[in-house]
UniProtKB/Swiss-Prot annotation:
It is found in: Cytoplasm. CRISPR (clustered regularly interspaced short palindromic repeat) is an adaptive immune system that provides protection against mobile genetic elements (viruses, transposable elements and conjugative plasmids). CRISPR clusters contain spacers, sequences complementary to antecedent mobile elements, and target invading nucleic acids. CRISPR clusters are transcribed and processed into CRISPR RNA (crRNA). The CMR complex degrades RNA complementary to the crRNA (target RNA) within UA dinucleotides, generating 3'-OH and 5'-phosphate ends. The keyword Cytoplasm applies. It comes from Saccharolobus solfataricus (strain ATCC 35092 / DSM 1617 / JCM 11322 / P2). This is CRISPR system CMR subunit Cmr5. GO terms for cellular component: cytoplasm. Part of the CMR ribonucleoprotein complex, consisting of crRNA plus Cmr1/Cmr2/Cmr3/Cmr4/Cmr5/Cmr6 at 1:1 and possibly 3 Cmr7 dimers. A Cmr2/Cmr3/Cmr7 subcomplex without crRNA can also be isolated. It does not cleave target RNA. Keywords: Antiviral defense, Cytoplasm.
Length: 156
């Protein structure tokens, strides 16, 4: 990976973290911090797709899909309230992953949002197809998210 790509990953991590930080209340931020610490390791232990399935199952998309798509569509200045539940922290971590994939043009944002709303199975199939590329490229970004969460989110 080139130095320019690394810088882009760090910049994206800061942008995504800022959006997530502003979308969660204090309790959910603490939970997100745990997700950021655990999920990056889980992706490289269990694999991207099994971990993604787990995150999706915990994110409560059946009830909160509109919040996730709104966050993906929002400019960085607009705040979306994801809430304070465990689901919110998983949804925030799912957002972090999907944000990277769309902003780095690994997957088209319009396709991503459309499939989140209308056909998640087709989206999962596409992510499965791209998983070798995703796994190879996303680690530095997720590590940056982890470090930001550890540095900026206090736990009681």
């Amino acid at each position: 990976m080139t130095e320019v790509q690394e810088e882009k990953d760090y910049k994206l991590a800061i942008e995504a973290f800022n959006l997530v930080y502003n979308a969660l209340d204090k309790k959910a931020r603490e939970k997100f911090r745990s997700r950021a610490r655990d999920m990056v390791e889980e992706i490289y232990t269990s694999g991207f797709i099994p971990t993604l399935f787990y995150i999706i199952s915990k994110a409560g998309l059946e009830n909160n899909n509109d919040k996730l798509t709104a966050l993906l569509n929002s400019p960085s200045s607009k705040s979306i309230d994801l809430g304070s539940s465990d689901e919110a922290s998983y949804m925030a971590y799912l957002f972090v992953i999907l944000y990277y994939l769309s902003e780095r043009n690994i997957i088209n944002k319009e396709f991503l949002i459309n499939k989140l709303k209308n056909n998640r199975l087709e989206l999962i199939d596409k992510l499965y197809e791209l998983s070798p590329i995703i796994s190879a490229r996303i680690k530095r970004y997720l590590m940056a998210i982890k470090r930001l969460a550890e540095a900026l989110i206090e736990v009681r």
